Every structure is written in structure tokens, then in C-alpha cells.
């Protein structure tokens, strides 16, 4: 029988090594869980992005305000199409960007929109595109916003404001389509077409633009379903989103 003193240290050695291994495995497991959680959060965030939601179907956009945003987005959320609101922006004398009508600050509206997973189409009007882009980036809404301008100069400024922010470029002809492609360069852009544009023009701009925006055709001669069947459209702007959704559901 071995002397007790000769074996007294052995249990400590045997117990210590598995303990270290267990601790190491525990740390590794925690790290894996954290990475998995981060990946899940990132995936969920991307799922709410504009371009990702375009792949899942037509996006219906309706005019809204900073004050009515919550109610409007809640109403759209009950419909089959993703919710998108078109907001008019303005600059105050103190430099703050607000949503009209009303005086809601764009920063607050962006924060609310992110929580509600609401997409936004922002009309720049007289605002500085760089200021708007900075607010959008700070709110982590770059992938959920598209900027709209009525002038070429403001459009060019918006394209330079942030390389990751989608900018809508008005296109009325084949010449405009090629000019928009040259203007944007490597910057992602959306093409904003009139509903009276030809199906061929829609098809042409679809080759280069990240998204195609148009308005609901107000003509009894052509149903919305027929209109969309001949044109690649990603976003339809309409003041009557419920009627448009019902029309599309009735035709399917």
C-alpha cells in the first residue's frame, strides 16, 4: 500500500487540469454565444433595410408628417406591404431639420422610425443634404431611407453627402437615364419615374438603379395590376395605401 504522503498531491493535479479545461470551454461557449447573438442582431437589422424588403415584394409609400407618423405607420403595418412614409423636410433658423407640417425634429422622427421598422422617403426641399445625411447616419437608418430632391444641384450634393445613403434621381427620358447613371457613378441610387413613362424606360433604368420608384397611376383605362405587370417597380407612392393594397389583393 503506498504511503499516504506520496499520493496526497495527485488528486490536486487531476482535479486542477479538468477544472481549467472546463473554464476554458465555458469561456469559449460564452464567446460563441455572443458571436451568434451579434450575428442574429445584424441579420435582423438587415432584414428591415429597404433593399432587403424590396426583395420580398412591392413597397407602398404614403405621405406622412412627423405628428402622424406613428398612426400612419401603424395603419400600414396591418397591410401586406411593408410600411414607408414620405416626409417633407425644412430647415429652421437655428439649423435644425424638421418635418413639415409641424415642427417635429427629424432626429426624433428617425429614432421613432427605427423602433417601428418604418422606411422613410425624405424630400430634401431647402435643407442641406449633408445635415440630413448626418442625422440619418447617427440614427443608424442609412439602409432604411431614400432622399428625394427636385433639382439636379441638390441631387448631386445629396450623392456626395454619404456614400451609403440611397438617393432618388428623377428620370423622364432615355437621356435622363444615362445621365443619372453617370451622375451617380458608384453611388447607389433609386430611379424616380413618372407613371406616364413607357414600360421600356422602366426596364432600361431597372438595369442600373437599386430601386424603381413611381406613383400610383390615376387612370381608369389601366388597372394597377396591369400597370405593374408591364413595369419593374419596387416602390409606389400613393395617398391611398389601403385602396392600392386592396386593388392588388383583388387582382391576385
Residue map of PLM features:
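Phosphate-group recognition and catalysis centered on beta-loop-alpha active-site segments
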Residues: 2-252
